[in-house]
Each structure stands twice: as C-alpha cells, then as structure tokens.
C-alpha cells in the first residue's frame, strides 16, 4: 500500500439535517481524532475495536470547550473504503456545528481532501480499479433504479472482470508469439497464423458483443431526451400532461399557447425520460412565437427521439409535410391524434414513414399512451430492459473498446498480408493497452487526476 498524508472532508451534504459525517483517512486518522475526542468516563479512542463506534464529545483543543456530542466509528485498513485507517465522526447536522468540528480535525493535523481523493486512494491502493471508481460517481448521479443497479454491478467489478479476461487472452497470444520468435531453440509448441487468427477473431467477437449494448448503456446512465413536436393545437401539451400524470403545461383551444420549451421528467421501465414540449411549428409573424419555433427545431436536433403529433381529424397540409421532412432523418414516433373526432389523414401521404412507429391516439380519452411507452422501449431496448445485462455506460470505456477493436482488426489484416507472425504482436499489444485504459492499468496519470476531480468532496 502507498504512503499518503491524512486527509479529511465532510462526507454528507452540508446543511440542516439529523447528522453530519466527517471522514478522516490515513495513517494518523485515529490519533488525530483521539486528540480532539473526550469519551464517557474519560475514555479515549486508542483502544477502540475496528468496525465499532464510541460515544463522546468533540472538544476545542485550545480551550477544552465541548463543541458537539458525537459517535465515532473506526475502520481498520486495508478493510476500509480507502484501504487505509478511516475514522468517521458522526456529529449533529447543521452548517455551523459541522464546520466547527471540521476545523478542529484540520487543526489537529489532517489536510482537507481534494474532490474524489478518498476514492482515488482506494484506486491507488489497489482496492478497486478505475472502472469501479467511476461507478461510484454513477451511483451518486443515478436517475433511476436501472441506472443504480447497473452502476452497482460496475462497482462490484462486472465490467472489470470482462475486460481483464480479454486482456489475459491477448497477453497469452503475445507471450506465445514472442516465446516462439525469441527462443526458437526451445521445444515450444508453435502457434500458427491460422491459430492466432482464430483467437483474435474470437476476442473481436467478444468486444463487439460488449459494444452492442453501448447505446443502451448511455441511455441507462443519462436517460432519454424525447421531444414532442407538431403544429399548434395538435395536442402536444395534453400529451405531456398525460405522460407525466400532472397538469404542468397549459392546455387551451387557442393555437400558439405554448411559446417556450417545457421540460419534465418521467420513467419508463426504469429509464429516466426527459419529455420536452415545444412550441407549435408554423410560419408566424409573432416575434415571440418565432423564437419558440426556432427553439423547437434546436431541441429536435438535440433529441434522442422525436414524437411527431398530427391532427387526424384534418387532412395533411404543407406545414405538416414540412415538419415530417424535418424529423424523418431522426428516430421518431408518429402520433395520429384526435381519432375520436375524425380520421381524415390518408396513410399514403405518410407511406415513406415506418408504419411500425405510427400510432393512432386520442390523448383526450387516454387512448394510446401504453402503445407510446412500448414503442419507446422497442426503439431503444428491443422491447425489454434488463438490469442484469452488461451495459457500457461510460464514454471513456466505449472509446477504449473501440480502439481495442480497431487494433484487433489491424492485427487480422497484418496476418493476411504477411507470413511473419511477430509483426502482429504490435497490434495485439495496442489492443491490450487500450483495454487496460478502461481499468486504469495503462492510463496516464493526468487523465486519472481529471477523472477523480469530477467527484464531490468527501468521496
């Protein structure tokens, strides 16, 4: 284990609450806490058993004045979060009380931790790898139970295990090639080009399989952005209200009521969905409405999915067709709304659209909402979302896999173009290095520092 100084930070949100927790980690954590602690019957902390708590008071070292009534816990390294000795002081919640205790800890010899420094120490001390460390921040920022489960699985090493298996397979090929080339006099079983080709191809298939869920992984982590578009008064705001089951958007019979973008959140099958209700798209001389229309188009370009609403009680006009052409290059669902009062849209006019994603609805009567939700799941998750699936939720991990994939493809091409198998080891090493960047084994120190700087204090 590496040697570090002793650090401290407030591990809970600073504000009014039942308790605040001040975390101290490092070789001197227990002696620092003990120097400002007074236990019942004057007991100190030096004989505290690991993984137990002791009741007492934090005192101001200079005056002996009691600052707060506390419970102190002790976790002995390496069986702790950072793999170092950790002390946690549970004091009363509140900004002033917490800060006073924190000041005494720093006066006693601890240094204020940098953002993410506790988790960084867990990584540097070998308790977790980098992908597991990144999962910690994903757990904190998770927006749904699926994203929490996925992040917890990653923190337990689910991704690391897969990556390490791939690296072991690559390393085995490298070792065999180099042993064959460098020690020809030894009686080693020679690995032929065909054997290497088959092994690399197998690894490539495994990488492709992991990458196949990368888009779903991004959605699990960040959620979906869904934009509702259409002409004014087609039912966009009614749809938003129905989906979130609240009356957040104003609904009137007056076209152009919604002039700005309205954003709300809902959940479909455990996935967070940001629903964006936009201003009706039409030609207008109203300056404010024009700005709203431009914002609508911006939101379409930023979205993962467009829900285009058409009024089925009226025939399509040029404005409808213009909107259809605008969204046709994106993932979309077409809602033929107001079917309760008419069905005048000729389906031949929208025959260039995928009929699987055309839904007849009457939002006023609550018809078609389940179809919309099922369609979203079909578009992005092939109909079902399973928390036990292996999701690549991190863009950095995805990039590492793509680079490793490219190196494997180059290795296969090298094998096809040359009879010398030692040349292929360069490409295989590159694949091994790129996969190692995911777990942090081969990543540059400045990038590691940048990753941990995104964490909150106390974590």
Swiss-Prot record:
Binds 1 potassium ion per subunit. Pfam families: MMR_HSR1 (PF01926), MnmE_helical (PF12631), TrmE_N (PF10396). The keyword Magnesium applies. It comes from the Bacteria. Keywords: Cytoplasm, GTP-binding, Hydrolase, Magnesium, Metal-binding, Nucleotide-binding, Potassium, tRNA processing. The keyword Nucleotide-binding applies. One of its GO terms (biological process) is tRNA methylation. K(+) binds at residues 233, 252, 254, 257. Belongs to the TRAFAC class TrmE-Era-EngA-EngB-Septin-like GTPase superfamily. TrmE GTPase family. Homodimer. Heterotetramer of two MnmE and two MnmG subunits. This is tRNA modification GTPase MnmE.
